[in-house]
């Protein structure tokens, strides 16, 4: 039985759409590693193509079909080592399947298991981060396709609010003065204790464009995010570990803006070999403990713009 191609008919309302596709598509993926065992991921895919005003719909089944083909066939035929390269393969295949499309995009999110040790007792545990990949392709009038790819990570940490901590410090100084302590004694006391403040669970995200011929290590991105907050979080903590984590975070208070700026500086320092027009996205979200809202900071820029700003500040 032959069915009419309803998707190829003209729509009642002739307006083009920028993104049509499928989301929340999960698939088991095995990525090769040089001289190491394969990495097994269970990523969630979002795949989109644009749709011209002359066509009623995309052929929706072709998008998950592309994922299936790339994961099952291309990964066996090619040596693909990164999620960003996997994303490029999917974008190119989307253009093959959706011949009417001039733009194609994929986003990939996956949990990423990391082995960690607690800071004091050195207990082994597994920590979960999130790796992200994005590829975006554009096809010109001559059929030439240009694809940009990005790779990144999302990591959870802890932040301590500097503002509340400063207020509590001022209150402590005033109370100690009332009780007759000298300025010298107060200074010694404050140096010996950790001043309280409210905390947030911070979520840091860094996405970096990967130009052709260059490599961007996800492990380096994860390290940058971890080191840009007040402290790290751990799945397994004994009492001495817990005391260490809390004290360390309170000795390193940061606003959401501080975390974003710290990530920016570290990205520029660590990835100084990337071309100047390399795109960088940095985002920090802090889940507030004493408010119902969250705090947010973001910067979307190029390596050159970020480097120039940092140079201006140091001169």
From Swiss-Prot:
Pathway info: Cofactor biosynthesis; 5,6,7,8-tetrahydromethanopterin biosynthesis
InterPro entries in alphabetical order: GTP_cyclohydrolase_FolE2/MptA, GTP_cyclohydrolase_MptA
Residues flagged as site, May be catalytically important: 161
One Gene Ontology biological process: tetrahydromethanopterin biosynthetic process
Gene Ontology terms for molecular function: GTP cyclohydrolase I activity; GTP cyclohydrolase IV activity; iron ion binding
Reaction catalysed by this enzyme: GTP + H2O = 7,8-dihydroneopterin 2',3'-cyclic phosphate + formate + diphosphate + H(+)
The EC number(s) this enzyme carries: 3.5.4.39
Biological role: Converts GTP to 7,8-dihydro-D-neopterin 2',3'-cyclic phosphate, the first intermediate in the biosynthesis of coenzyme methanopterin.
PANTHER family in UniProt: GTP CYCLOHYDROLASE MPTA
Full protein name: GTP cyclohydrolase MptA
Native source organism of the sequence: Methanococcus maripaludis (strain C5 / ATCC BAA-1333)
